[in-house]
């Protein structure tokens, strides 16, 4: 048995989807706190880097000059004159488009043997819970991410929302849970997709 001084990261490699990874996983903190560059650096060194999908339309606007949030602001202003903002729903196809653009660029910059995953929080809904979550999940798969970490919610239906996507069985999928009860609920609901 090796002494502590003789241990190296290579002694603890993880095999995941045919790749041998070092045991470094960087979390996906939202609104570009965990930047693409940070996740790419971790992946380049053989670990798993995460980005978050929180506020991806705004992030795409700031990084790529798109107009997702401007479009929303104009629509809200027009609606406010008549009924108020409460009735406005951001078009889910734009959410999927923004996710695919941002996450696709992150994946284009990946080098090395590591992986890039996206942290998707169930609780970010934009007034249309299931439709918004589905668009975010499918946008991530469209972009070619290596994996999705499901967090901030039970995600009982998330596998079903993605199950028709061509990459559903290719991407690594994981869930962050806070209790055995939450895990059991997730497992029971997700088992129907045949992906567990």
Where are these regions (language model features)?
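Active-site entrance/lid segments in N-terminal catalytic domains of soluble metabolic enzymes
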Residues: 1-196
